[in-house]
């Protein structure tokens, strides 16, 4: 299982339970108020269009190859991405591993 939080332009996803997830086959889809972001984050990345550089944890290329329970990943959506994260917006994140959806998460942006 995974937990999702969002504050300002910062999105944090935490691995809360279950098997470790190999990052080599992980894909993330992010949406705001029902609309997918124009630019989706590759995993892992250091710099990517539509995102501030230097994500932490599971999304940073310097991390382990597996995302284990208790570990988090944080990224920041840049103002050049569309739609932007606004307070109160409904943020959705879907995690896919090897083409199979492993999590569908939702929260309000704080």
Task: Kindly give the residue locations of the regions a language model identified.
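N-terminal export/assembly leader peptides and their processing motifs that target proteins to secretory
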Residues: 1-110
């Amino acid at each position: 299982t995974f937990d999702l939080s969002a504050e300002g332009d910062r999105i944090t996803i935490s691995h809360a339970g279950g098997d470790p997830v190999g990052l080599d086959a992980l894909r993330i889809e992010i949406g705001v108020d029902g609309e997918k972001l124009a630019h989706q984050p590759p995993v892992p990345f250091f710099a990517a269009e539509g995102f501030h550089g230097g994500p932490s944890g599971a999304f940073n290329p310097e991390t382990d190859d597996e995302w284990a329970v208790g570990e988090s990943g944080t990224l920041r959506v840049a103002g050049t991405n569309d739609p932007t994260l606004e307070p109160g917006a409904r943020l959705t994140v879907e995690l896919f591993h090897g083409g199979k959806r492993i999590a569908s998460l939702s929260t309000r942006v704080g």
